[in-house]
C-alpha cells in the first residue's frame, strides 16, 4: 500500500472516529455507534506502534462491551470483541499470554456463532481462530514482533534460506491478512450502517 493511500485511510478512519465520538456525546445509548467506534479504533490501531495499537485495541474492547451492556444480543459487537482479542494476541510475543487472548477470541466467536449460526463471517472467524496460535508461533519465529504495524518491509533478495522459509512467511501473512480483513469488514459494515438513510415516519 502506498503512503498516500495509507494516509487517506487514516484520515477516513479518524473522521469516522470523531463522528462516533460526537454521536456518543449526544446519544450515549446508541449500541450501533459504539460498535462503529470500536471498529474504527481497531482499524486505526494498524497504523500505530505496537504499544499504542494494544492500547487502542483495549479501548475498542471497552466500546464493544459498552454496546453489549445496551444491547446484550448485539452479535456484531460480540464478533468484534473476538477480532479485537485476536489482534491483541498477534501483537503479543509471549505465547502463553497470546494463547489466553486467542482463547478469549474463541469464546466470543462461538457466542457470535450461537447468536447467528448461518453467518459465514462468524463461522470462518471461529474456524480461523483455532489455527491462530500456530500462525502466531510461526509469525514470531520469523520476526513479526519487531515490525511496525501497518508497514511491510521491502523483501530481501532471494536466497536459499528465503525460499526455505517461504511457507513460514506465507503463514505470517495469512495471519495478519486475516486480522486486517476482519477489522476492515467490521469498519465497512459499521460505516455502511452509519450512512443508511432514515426513512421519514408515515
UniProtKB/Swiss-Prot annotation:
The modification N-acetylmethionine is found at residue 1. TPR repeats lie at residues 38-74, 86-119. The keyword Protein transport applies. One of its GO terms (biological process) is protein targeting to mitochondrion. It is a single-pass membrane protein. Disruption phenotype: No visible phenotype. Triple mutants tom20-2-tom20-3-tom20-4 are vible but display a slightly delayed flowering time. Residues 146-166 are annotated as: Disordered. The N-terminus is blocked. Keywords: Acetylation, Membrane, Mitochondrion, Mitochondrion outer membrane, Protein transport, Repeat, TPR repeat, Transmembrane, Transmembrane helix, Transport. GO terms for cellular component: cytosol; mitochondrial inner membrane; mitochondrial outer membrane; mitochondrial outer membrane translocase complex; mitochondrion; TIM23 mitochondrial import inner membrane translocase complex. Expressed in roots, flowers, young cotyledons and leaves. InterPro entries: TOM20_imprt_rcpt, TPR-like_helical_dom_sf. Residues 1-174 are cytoplasmic. Gene3D superfamilies: Tetratricopeptide repeat domain. It is found in: Mitochondrion outer membrane. Residues 193-202 are mitochondrial intermembrane. It comes from the Eukaryota. The chain crosses the membrane at residues 175-192. One of its GO terms (molecular function) is protein-transporting ATPase activity. Belongs to the Tom20 family. There are four genes (TOM20-1, TOM20-2, TOM20-3 and TOM20-4) which encode mitochondrial import receptor subunits TOM20. In mammals and fungi, the transmembrane domain is located at the N-terminus while it is located at the C-terminus in plants. The overall orientation of the protein in the membrane is therefore inverted. Central component of the receptor complex responsible for the recognition and translocation of cytosolically synthesized mitochondrial preproteins. Together with TOM22 functions as the transit peptide receptor at the surface of the mitochondrion outer membrane and facilitates the movement of preproteins into the translocation pore. Forms part of the preprotein translocase complex of the outer mitochondrial membrane (TOM complex) which consists of at least 6 different proteins (TOM5, TOM6, TOM7, TOM20, TOM22/TOM9 and TOM40). Component of a mitochondrial large protein complex that contains, at least, MIC60, DGS1, TOM40, TOM20 proteins, and petC/RISP. This is Mitochondrial import receptor subunit TOM20-3. It comes from Arabidopsis thaliana (Mouse-ear cress). The lineage of its organism: Eukaryota, Viridiplantae, Streptophyta, Embryophyta, Tracheophyta.
